[in-house]
Structure formats: structure tokens, C-alpha cells
Amino acid sequence: MGNHKAALTKQVFTFASELYAYGVREVVISPGSRSTPLALAFEAHPNIKTWIHPDERSAAFFAVGLIKGSERPVAILCTSGTATANYTPAIAESQISRIPLIVLTSDRPHELRSVGAPQAINQVNMFNNYVSYEFDMPIADDSKETIDAIYYQMQIASQYLYGPHKGPIHFNLPFRDPLTPDLNATELLTSEMKILPHYQKSIDASALRHILNKKKGLIIVGDMQHQEVDQILTYSTIYDLPILADPLSHLRKFDHPNVICTYDLLFRSGLDLNVDFVIRVGKPVISKKLNQWLKKTDAFQILVQNNDKIDVFPIAPDISYEISANDFFRSLMEDTRVNRVSWLEKWQCIEKKGRKEIKCYLEQATDESAFVGELIKKTSEKDALFISNSMPIRDVDNLLLNKNIDVYANRGANGIDGIVSTALGMAVHKRITLLIGDLSFYHDMNGLLMSKLNNIQMNIVLLNNDGGGIFSYLPQKESATDYFERLFGTPTGLDFEYTAKLYQFDFKRFNSVSEFKNATLLSETSTIYELITNREDNFKQHQILYQKLSEMIHDTL
């Protein structure tokens, strides 16, 4: 028994030290018995911060938020059995978004698998469709090979924690009773750093010259890292190219004349210009209308993504590059300048008129877009916005016009799962205000526990239209009128003031835009600001905006 304890201690302390060596500074633990050895190892490590969350689904999304905020890999740990399956939604989001989430599932020893033992399900390869790498670790013993396996496997897995290959990885770790390591053996816990992987690629600019010398070009930028925007702006300025900037591109922070923000409303309103080439950068954009245009345009399409797996949605490009945006545009700086002044000015003119129409609309509107517009005004440059999927991200796409704030969202799988938890994870590292609808909020109310337990400050702006507002914009609204409210509207009638009390948030309710205009978003306390809206009225007022912009496009072109 003494040998078992020594072997277990060496295994889990070495594993914790190797995670630290490859950049892990935070671990989110969901309590359980089988995970005891690793949980104690992480708690004993002097340079690893542990977070405790009893809900595995919310815990995993909280870790996703920590990664977004710190730009470092984060590990999650749970016990064996069905607890592990609750990680699946966050792992799926991480896979599509290229987030280096390290999934650690504790398991029963091999002799207790498939024999009816409690809390034992098949955990080997259980996330096979969503992880970049996975390994079923050997059980602790006295052999050198068992410890070597940790070194080898972490070295292999590290390529998925940094660079273009980023994504979630899964280690399944079986533990045999007794489960308690020797906590006095702290000399086995080390804080040495490994040399992290570095990736660099170049392109042959001459191969693109015949395309980029054409006059009518666009740069379309989706979700991407802050540090990749500099060369995009420089290239756009030198070569007179409009930039259609998604709200997650971090380009709308800049008051730059080439940054176009109103394109979703413009394309929705009938804008259809002939274009010679498009340079698509980063992940796919949020705008459905822009994606539809990309599918039908005859323009030559170049895709630039710093990933090992290129996301071609909405349509496969003519050519793609696995390279950072900075490296791509830097390599093109020697090209001959093309006179595109009239082309750029046309876009700038349309953008200016579009912004004017939006401003006039917001001065009169009383719908959700008016609330969102006010929130954007109230958000200081010290704060960032985390935006829920469904209608909130679409309204922000339409209404965020060049303000120096960062915007974040879970746009991998685009689901409403785990939004509260992800935002709270980010709030550990940044000042965050969360904009979310009532159904998305209900879906992850458990996530609020992390704020209560750890005193994490975050404001939540809750758009409450008592149901799923986005369905009012879909064909189901007209084709299934008798069943629409029950199947799609899904009103809940919940009073979220009780939620605020349960998790010790302050609570303020606003029944009109005018009330909200006079409100102050406090940064010292966590507050839920509930904004009461009406789905039908919201739909009708949005149609008015679309019509005004359609008339403007018709008159301009």
C-alpha cells in the first residue's frame, strides 16, 4: 500500500507540474471522489490557481471564459461517470473556436470498467468528435515508463495548445483506491517552463498579384485576435480597400474611415455591388446576409486563417492561406498601388448614410435595438462586452459603430449554452458587461454561482421579451401560426428578481428605453439590469429600420 501511495503521488504531482510547464495557470475543478488525487495535486501546486464549481457544464464554460480572458490554456477536472458527459457542449465550442481547453476526466481503474461498477461509463474516446488529441493514461505504478508517458503525452499534446493547431485535448486518468496522495512530498511539484511551440509561414505574393491589382476589392474580417489587426489597417490605408469588420474582429474599436460597420443592414436592404476580389480574414462573420452574398458573388475569394484546419464557410475560397493576418498583409506591402479612390469613396458614402439612418432610427425607437444602442453608449473604454448568441449579437452587429470597446462572444457552435459561465470566466481577467436574452440566461443560471462563491464582479444586461425573439424573424412565424408560441415563442413567465436574490446580485428593472437612458451601470457591484421588451413590437420596429435603409440604398445607387 505504501508503494501505491508513492506511485500515485509521483504520477499526479508530475502531471500537475507538466501542465504548469506548458503554460497552465488555472484549473477549474468540479468536486468528486475519483478526481481526489489530481484535485489535491493542483491545490498543492504553489503557482496554479484552482476554481471550484459543482456544475460540470457551467464549470467547463467558465474555463472557456478564463482562456478568452487570459489567452492561456486552462484545465478542467471532474470525477468519473456521467459527470464527464456534461463537459461536451463546452468542448464542442472549444473545438470550433480553436480554444485550448484541457479536459481531465477521472476514471475507474481498468478492472472496474464494463463490469457494472458504480460511476463507471466508457470514457475512452468519449469526446472523439470534438478534441484535437486524446489519451487514456496508464494507472499509477512503480515503473519509469508510467512517468515517461506523462512527459511524452504532454509534449505531443502541447502542439494543440498554441499556434494554428489550437483546440481542446482530453486526458482520461484512471485512479485506483486509496485515492489520497502524500501531500508532504511537495518537492515533486515543480514550476519549470518548457519552450513553447512557435509557428511561422510565408506566402508567395507574386502568385496573388494578378488578382490584387484589380480595382474593386474588399477585406472582410471575422472573429480574430487583437494582435492581428495592425497590418490589416495599414494595408487597407495604403491600398484604399474597404474593411467590412465583424463586431468580434476588434477593428470597430478604431475610428478609421475604411472600416465599414453597417454592411449587414446594407446587404439586407438590397446592396449588391460588383466586386473583383475578397480577402476573408479570421473566422466566418456573424452576418447572415453577408454570408449569403459571399455564396453567390463571382468575386475571387482569398481566405486567411491562422489555423491548421481552414473554416471555409459560407463557401470554399479560390485560395486559402494558413498564416497570421499580420504575416499575410506584411508580405503584400511591396505590391504596386492601384487607384481605388472612387471605389473606396463609394463605400464610405454608403456607410456614412447608413450610420445617419441608424442614428435617426435609434432616437425614435423603443425596441430592443434602442436598449442595445443605449448599452453601447454607456459602456466605457475600460469595459468589454460579452454578447449572447441569438438576437443580442445580431443587434450589436448592426449597432456597434466604431467605439473603443472590445466585444466577445461564443461564436464557435453559436449556441446559447454556457453564456453566463463563459462571461464570468472572462470577468476574472477583464471588466465585463454581459448582454443576454431571457432564454439564454435561464439556460445557464447555475453559472452565477461562481460570482457568489468567488466575488467575481460582472454586470448583466438582460433583455427579457419572455421567450425566443429571434424566431419572429424566421419563416416559422408565418407558416406555423397555430403552434408558433408554444413551439418557438416558448414564454416562461419567470421573475428573474428571485434569481438575483439567490446569487446575491443587485437587481434593477426597466420598462422603457427612457428609464434605461437615465440609469448608470455600476462597476463596484454585480447587478442584473432587466430590460422588459415585447417580441412583436421589436419585430415591427426592426422592419421599419430595414425599410428606411432599403430606400436609402435605392436613392444612393
Curated annotation (Swiss-Prot):
Its EC number is 2.2.1.9. InterPro entries: MenaQ_synth_MenD, MenD_middle, THDP-binding, Thiamin_PyroP_enz_TPP-bd_dom, TPP_enzyme_TPP-bd. The keyword Calcium does not apply. Binds 1 thiamine pyrophosphate per subunit. Disulfide bonds: none annotated. Pathway: Quinol/quinone metabolism; 1,4-dihydroxy-2-naphthoate biosynthesis; 1,4-dihydroxy-2-naphthoate from chorismate: step 2/7; Quinol/quinone metabolism; menaquinone biosynthesis. It catalyses: isochorismate + 2-oxoglutarate + H(+) = 5-enolpyruvoyl-6-hydroxy-2-succinyl-cyclohex-3-ene-1-carboxylate + CO2. Homodimer. Catalyzes the thiamine diphosphate-dependent decarboxylation of 2-oxoglutarate and the subsequent addition of the resulting succinic semialdehyde-thiamine pyrophosphate anion to isochorismate to yield 2-succinyl-5-enolpyruvyl-6-hydroxy-3-cyclohexene-1-carboxylate (SEPHCHC). Belongs to the TPP enzyme family. MenD subfamily. This is 2-succinyl-5-enolpyruvyl-6-hydroxy-3-cyclohexene-1-carboxylate synthase. It comes from Staphylococcus aureus (strain bovine RF122 / ET3-1).
